[in-house]
């Protein structure tokens, strides 16, 4: 399970109570992400970044006041000593799965899904999230 929120620099972040308050405020998203597609689908203004680290750089440089990302991504791109962005509004909770070519052999896909399920069941995914300071519960 992954949570995506709208993040802003800690100095004077926009005050949002819901996505209806977003209006045409531009939001930086990772190109092709669920957040990007969701925000575009509700009429949001999206600035797409080709890499997560570019999203952080765009936010720092004022390209847009908000960045749609997850806590795991934040911890991976914000350098030690930098002031991390603050969450303004949570927007999506996603159940994670794998993206695979539609023509992939169904047996191979089932094997990969079973391996992913096993990683969750054995606690490996939780351990990885904890390593980056994120709790799934």
Task: Label every PLM stretch briefly.
Residues 9-10, 30-33, 52, 68-77:
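Beta->alpha turn/N-cap motifs
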Residues 1-21, 32, 85-91:
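Acidic, polar ligand-binding/catalytic clefts
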Residues 21, 41-42, 52-72, 80-81:
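Short helices/loops that flank or line small-molecule/ion binding pockets
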Residues 29, 44-52, 58, 87-88:
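Short beta-strand-to-loop elements that line the ligand-binding cleft
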Residues 1-5, 75, 79-117, 136-137:
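Periplasmic-binding protein-like
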Residues 20, 37, 53, 57, ...:
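Solvent-exposed, polar/charged alpha-helical surfaces in well-ordered, non-transmembrane soluble domains
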Residues 10-13, 25-26, 33, 98-136:
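Extended ligand-binding regions for polar small-molecule ligands
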Residues 32-40:
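Aromatic-rich, solvent-exposed beta-strand/loop patch
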């Amino acid at each position: 399970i992954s949570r995506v929120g709208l993040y802003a620099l800690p100095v004077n972040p926009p005050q949002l109570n819901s996505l209806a308050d977003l209006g045409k405020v531009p939001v930086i998203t990772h190109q092709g992400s669920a957040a990007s597609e969701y925000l575009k689908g509700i009429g949001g203004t999206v600035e797409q970044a080709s890499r997560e680290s570019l999203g952080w750089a765009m936010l720092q440089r004022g390209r847009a006041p908000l960045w749609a990302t997850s806590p795991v991504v934040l911890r991976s791109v914000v350098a030690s000593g930098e002031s991390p962005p603050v969450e303004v509004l949570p927007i999506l909770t996603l159940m994670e799965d794998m993206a695979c070519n539609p023509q992939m052999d169904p047996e191979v896909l089932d094997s990969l899904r079973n391996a992913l399920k096993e990683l969750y069941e054995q606690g490996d995914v939780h351990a990885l999230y904890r390593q980056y300071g994120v709790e799934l519960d």
